[in-house]
Amino acid sequence: MSTTYLLGLAVALAMDAFAVAIAVGIGLKRIRFRQAFRLSYHFGLFQALMPIIGWALGTGIRQFTQSYAHWIAFTLLALVGANMIREALSDDEEEPGEKDPTRGLRLIILSLATSIDALAVGLSLSMLEVSIWYPALIIGLVAGAFTLFGMLLGQRIAKLQRFSSYAEVLGGIILWAIGLNILYDNGVFSPFL
C-alpha cells in the first residue's frame, strides 16, 4: 500500500472525527489542554484500534458491517446530539464540566461513532493481505491531529457567534447533520429522492 494512498485513506477516515471535534469545540465554553488532549487521544486511539479489530475479524462480519455500520454511527451521533440540544435548552444549573463531552460515556460514544468506518476499512485491508500495524498507526495519528484542529476551529467559530448561549445547540445540530449525512452517503434516502 503506497504512502499516498494510506494518507488519503487516513484523511478520509478523519473527516467524521474532524466534524465532531468542531461541534465539541463549539459547545465548550473554553477548551482546556486536558480536554483537547483527551478528545484527540481517544479519537486517534479508536481510529487506530478499529482497523486492527476489523482486520482481525476478517470476513466474518463483513456483511454486517456493510449493512448496519451507518445506522450504528447515526444512532450514536443522534443520541449525543439530541442530548446536547436538550441540555442547552434546559434551565438546569449543572456543575462545570458535567456536560463535558471529553469525559466519560459521551467520550466513548463519540469515539465509537467516529471510528466505525475504520472497522470496515480494517476488514477491507484484511482481504488485501497487508500488514495492519503501519496503516493503523497513520490512521490514528491523522485522526488525532484532525480532532485537535477541529476542536480549535470549533472554538473560534463559537467565539464569532453573536449568541454564544446557542453554541451547544449548534453543536448538537451539527452532530445530527453528520449522522444524516452518513445515512445519505449509504443510500438510505435514495428511494425518496
Swiss-Prot record:
Role summary: Probably functions as a manganese efflux pump.
Chain segments annotated as transmembrane: 6-26, 41-61, 65-85, 107-127, 132-152, 169-189
Name by which UniProt lists this protein: Putative manganese efflux pump MntP
Topology within the bilayer: Multi-pass membrane protein
Entries under InterPro entries matching the protein: Mntp/YtaF, Put_MntP
Family assignment from sequence similarity: Belongs to the MntP (TC 9.B.29) family.
GO molecular function term, any single one: manganese ion transmembrane transporter activity
Coiled coil ranges: none
Entry's localization field: Cell inner membrane
Keyword Cell membrane tagged: yes
UniProt superkingdom: Bacteria
PANTHER family per record: MANGANESE EFFLUX PUMP MNTP-RELATED
GO cellular component: plasma membrane
Gene that encodes it: mntP
Predominant location: membrane
